[in-house]
Design a protein with these regions (language model features):
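NAD(P)+-binding Rossmann beta1-loop-alpha1 motif at the extreme N-terminus of oxidoreductases
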Residues: 1-44
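Active-site-proximal catalytic alpha-helix in oxidoreductases
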Residues: 163-188, 196-214
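Rossmann-fold NAD(P) dinucleotide-binding segment
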Residues: 53-100
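Rossmann-fold dinucleotide-binding core
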Residues: 94, 101-160, 164-167
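Short beta-strand-centered aromatic/proline hotspots
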Residues: 309-318
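Interdomain hinge/lid region at the active-site interface
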Residues: 194-275
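C-terminal, non-catalytic macromolecule-binding modules
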Residues: 321-363
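A carboxyl-terminal module marker
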Residues: 1, 345-430
């Protein structure tokens, strides 16, 4: 199946290449042809300069362009789509893209307005939410729905109108309040780094979430606000809520403040579940820092959560939000996962060149070779020990025997430890 992605050089469109390329024949287009070709080459997919040409050759056409361009691109390419194909968009508003599809696509072309409720930094589809807002369900709908469920995604089906209302809460309201908070901090000339000395776990989580939103493309954030038809009402109610709360405090009306707080709490749903989830997040953050502090002076493996690269070394120190290894590598704690001892060992097996050495040692003939082998295989970083020879004859005194072991290990240090244990058993190295 041929999947075309208009807007495949950036953002979610680029992320979709990663998900699709192993299962489908993928081609992309982009506004910046130089960048588009580079991404296509890096991701090993085809590049097509013309949006309309890509539409004409695709079984499924994915529109992944900025919100403010989505409708115009749909109208541009819609008439060129071939019979039996399907158009999918991935923008975070649905009413206007749906209307454009209904008006510009031929009758024999299906369309499924969608909204993946996750960003381009998401590395796994498992348990991610995707919203479908179909008005018709043709042959393509079941195929798409089944594919998404096969990836363990949470598929929500609703109308475009209801979707946009829910997004006015999930995105418009939350983004507006977060950006307002960040803007207030900027106007107050707050030094965020200085507040870290006083931060509570909840403040820490809040700052990270706010930073995540304000660091997004500001044009994307703006169009999420301005192009959702429910936006004006949402922002008006938010401003009124802020004014009401401020007035209660300024007028020293504690009863009014408590009334507002209690009513707000009652509307927050399952409070115990929210407390449990936030406790888990706080515990996870604290556990990671505790684990790092306990590992100072010891070998550790840190996996970058975005690149997947594993950094191995002795942890020299944890300096604020940075972990520093003895080889000079500096990593932001927020961006790494501490691997377990078992995961570190497996990484070494997969990535370090194994050392092999044949070791001969003379023992009393009363020793039991299998016991020695079992003991040696328990040595740290020893992969395998094989008894290759038992010899009694010339050059070996009576009552003794020579045992030869082939030792496979991850380091020369491990092989030296094996030799030390052999001599500890009373053996004499040959």
């Amino acid at each position: 199946m041929k999947i075309g992605i208009i807007g495949g050089s950036d953002g979610l469109g680029k992320t979709l290449i990663y998900y699709f390329r192993d299962e489908f024949d993928v081609a992309i287009s982009a506004r910046d042809h130089i960048k588009g070709r580079k991404v296509a080459e890096e991701m090993n997919v085809d590049y097509v300069e013309s949006n309309t040409q890509l539409a004409a050759m695709s079984d499924m056409l994915v529109i992944s362009v900025p919100i403010n361009n989505t409708v115009s691109v749909i109208r541009e390419v819609g008439p060129f789509m071939r019979k039996g194909s399907v158009m999918v968009d991935v923008t975070s508003i649905k009413e206007e893209p749906l209307r454009a599809m209904e008006e510009s696509l031929p009758e024999n072309v299906e369309y499924i307005p969608t909204h993946p409720v996750f960003g381009p930094r998401t590395t796994e589809l498992d348990n991610q939410i995707i919203v479908l807002t179909p008005t018709k369900k043709g042959e393509w709908y079941k195929r798409v729905h089944d594919y998404l469920e096969s990836k363990n995604m949470r598929v929500i089906e609703t109308t475009a109108e209801h979707h946009d209302y829910m997004m006015s809460i999930v995105q418009v309201l939350t983004h507006f309040s977060f950006i307002s908070t960040a803007s207030a901090m900027e106007k107050l000339k707050v030094d965020i780094n200085e507040t870290e000395d006083y931060e509570s776990p909840i403040y820490n989580l809040m700052i990270d979430m706010i930073a995540r939103i304000v660091s997004q493309n500001p044009y994307l954030t703006y169009y999420i606000q301005s192009m959702n038809n429910n936006g004006p009402k949402i922002r008006k109610v938010f401003s009124e809520a802020v004014d009401e709360l401020r007035d209660a405090i300024d007028s020293e009306d504690d009863e009014k403040f408590v009334e507002i707080a209690i009513n707000a709490t009652k509307n927050m749903g399952d409070i115990q579940n929210a407390l449990g989830m936030s406790d888990k997040a706080i515990t996870a953050l604290s556990h990671e820092y505790s684990l790092l502090n306990e590992s100072v002076g010891h070998e550790i493996a840190l996996k970058h959560i975005y690149s997947g690269k594993v950094h191995v070394g002795v942890l020299e120190r944890v300096n604020g939000k940075t972990a520093i290894l003895d080889n000079g590598t500096k990593l932001r704690v927020a961006n790494v996962e501490v691997l377990s001892d078992e995961e570190l060992y497996q990484w070494k097996l997969d990535n370090i060149e194994w050392k092999k050495q044949s070791i001969s040692c003379v023992f009393s003939e009363s020793v039991i070779p299998n016991v020695i082998v079992e003991t040696l295989e328990k040595v740290d970083e020893v992969i395998e020990v094989v008894l290759t020879d038992i010899y009694q004859g010339p050059q070996i005194d009576e009552g003794f025997k020579s045992l030869t072991f082939e030792v496979t290990a991850l380091s020369n240090e491990a092989i030296q430890n094996v030799k030390s244990i052999l001599t500890g058993f009373g053996g004499v190295l040959r």
